[in-house]
Amino acid sequence: LAAAGFLIVSGLTGAVISWDHELDELLNPHLTEAVAEGPAIPSLALASMIEARDPRARVTYVPLAAEPGHSINFGISPRVDPATGRLYELGYNEVFVDPASGRELGRREWGAVWPITTETVVSFLYVLHYSLHVPELWGIELWGVWLMGIVAIVWTIDCFVGFYLTLPRRLAPAPRRRANSWWSRWKPAWQIKTGGSAYRINFDIHRAFSLWTWVLLFIVAFTAFSLNLYSEVFHPLMSRVSEVTPTPFDQRELADRHQPIEPIVSFPTVIERAVVEARARGWQEPAGDINYDQGYGIFGVGFFHPGDDHGSAGVGPPYLYYDGRDGRFL
């Protein structure tokens, strides 16, 4: 019961954010649609224009090509204010640009708690889904993520407890009585006795539906735990029972939020090296985007065609990672 409220919020928001891209385009055509005609300006040039308009901002995510008729959505991170030694408060972390004209279509704070508008409602639900918008406390931003991860662990354990409680009791030996088979005694747990009392029908619905959907419930619970507590619990546990290849992020400590790692190599240099490496691996897709994580000092270059950034079956496209200081392949 304690977990039910969390699961209701997570389930309802999860159903909505499954369509986040489609809903965002429906609600915000003024941001996502581009009307100017003509050849597209190179994305890196557009990124430089954004930084020139606001020197407090650093472009940390650059889509390298736009879908026809769509704007380009750049990810933004704040630079450090030399006067305070802390990050600037920009009030936005996304900028939408018409790729043909270079005109800025708008800015927004993805995941903002307030105000909730058509521009922010989808991202509000997205963050609510996995962190409940729990604020930063004692310099840590992950309290909400950890809380939902703990709820997922409880749910995972509850899946096994509930399954065990449906199993038939072990019968005491009775030499003169022929016992029913184990399956025949468990079979009623999978059925709903419609002729019983309201309490019995409700109990049967709860038990039967839980059994028929048990595998799905377990998968959702286990994956939620593994996503929210990946580095804290899941990866260390899996490393004990199997060989797990660490990601570049697993091998580094996260820098202090207000002391980001400044990149030394540039976007063009990293893209050039990544394209060479991708061709050596036999990848045919073009470089689709580049991002820089200033908390870890790592560049990532994804390879996909425009509009295919979710990859096959939603698992995402392949990425190559490079060190932000010396540009070496990670």
Role assignments for model-derived ranges:
Residues 1-330:
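Conserved histidines in hydrophobic membrane contexts and catalytic metal-binding motifs
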